[in-house]
Amino acid sequence: SAAGFNEIIINIHHFGQQIIDFVEANNSFGIRIEFSDEREQLLDTGGGIKKAAWFFDDNRPFMVHNVDILSNIDLEEVAKQHSLNGSAATLVCSERETNRYLLFNEQNHLRGWINKKTGETKSPFTGFKPANYTELAFSGIQVLHPSIFREMDSFPGRFYIIDFYLSLSVTYKI
């Protein structure tokens, strides 16, 4: 809540009951905390967000923060920048060494993805050439506008969020 968030939904899978017990033992830390249960089937980030759509019914942007990410980034500032830039999704990225990179044009709009280890690339854009774009590593932190849920209708219950963002990047600012 120190970063301005007072409603949280947690996707649970591994040690799900321990997470629920911990939150309940701490009186939900004085904020609204709900759970989206994936103990029977992991849905990947995209499917997890889609399953939790019911929680985001107030038409306000929301933040997704992967559990295995430690960061000292100012989350309040990330949310503020998202509101200022008018994007459907704002992805927190950095210049760091990894095998997989998101590829951005000069306006910082998402245009593709590359796996440097395997050479695999993905892009919805014709004539895509990875060397023409800036490589940034995705942090697993993102701010989304609820309008993206209607675009998820054509995606299955389980899907990778990067594939979704790439499909959106044709018509939306990502």
Ranges and model annotations:
Residues 1-66, 77, 155:
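Conserved N-terminal catalytic core of the sugar/cofactor nucleotidyltransferase
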Residues 11, 36-38, 90-93, 113:
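Generic beta-sheet signal
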Residues 12-15, 85, 168:
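Hydrophobic/aromatic residues within well-ordered alpha-helical segments
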Residues 60-65, 70, 75-83, 96-97, ...:
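Catalytic-core segments of class I nucleotidyltransferases/pyrophosphorylases
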Residues 85-95, 100:
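A short, conserved acidic/glycine-rich loop-to-beta-strand motif
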Residues 103-105:
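Short beta-strand-to-turn element immediately C-terminal to the catalytic PLP-Schiff-base lysine
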